[in-house]
């Protein structure tokens, strides 16, 4: 479920597993422990999870320094406490209900939108992105001298959650206060404000993702994860020149979903 360290580089003759095999051997147990804690709220540290959410905005490097500390104390990089995931889910539900209210949706339309956003936009897309990043990082970014190390899928999912939270707050919460009276007014100021919020949100996602993988000492060339900034800036400039309002497109898509 998480990046692992090595005690030996290969299978010994006496049958002892190398670190990569050992990590995979225990991954199932760690996943089971994590999922089991999802239903034990008293064991979750919500205060610490809230602290992480704050610092993902103000100083995301501090969040990943804590990941290093966890590796040293618990011998794992990924979170073993699902409190962050629970708080993120609450944020997602509340902000989606707010979207339904702003777009003047009925009760059942809002519930349908909520199910779409949670299970498709968050969980489905999150699983897809995490799996892609897990594959790419293990295939192309692991240092040659560190082949006994690997990025486990669970850590890739944690990085996605970290990067998704600022994007969620910007696009699903802050943006709500500007949608009807500014962003959807079909003026230059409208799509300037809306598209700038999209630029900041997606930029945050790219940057926090980069920090997550650059925090792993056995990966190389993680700077390539910043390359999407270039096409993002080009797309932003084109959207302003062509009058393409990203938020208007999103709202139309949400309304189409719940028909």
From Swiss-Prot:
A cellular-component GO term for this protein: Golgi apparatus
Keyword presence, Disulfide bond: no
InterPro entries per UniProt: UNC-50
PTM-bearing positions, type N-acetylmethionine: 1
Cellular compartments annotated: Nucleus inner membrane; Golgi apparatus membrane
Gene: Unc50
Molecular function via GO: RNA binding
Source organism: Mus musculus (Mouse)
Topology relative to the membrane: Multi-pass membrane protein
Tissue specificity note: Highly expressed in periodontal ligament and bone marrow, but not in gingival fibroblasts.
GO biological process per UniProt: protein localization to cell surface
Residues annotated as transmembrane: 83-103, 113-133, 164-184, 188-208, 223-243
Protein name: Protein unc-50 homolog
Range of residues in the leader sequence: none
UniProt xrefs under Pfam families: UNC-50
Job description of the protein: Involved in the cell surface expression of neuronal nicotinic receptors. Binds RNA.
Keywords on record: Acetylation, Golgi apparatus, Membrane, Nucleus, Phosphoprotein, RNA-binding, Transmembrane, Transmembrane helix
Lumenal side: 104-112, 185-187, 244-259
Cytoplasmic membrane side: 1-82, 134-163, 209-222
Family: Belongs to the unc-50 family.
Keyword match Hydrolase: no
Phosphoserine PTM positions: 6
Main localization of the protein described in the UniProt heading: nucleus
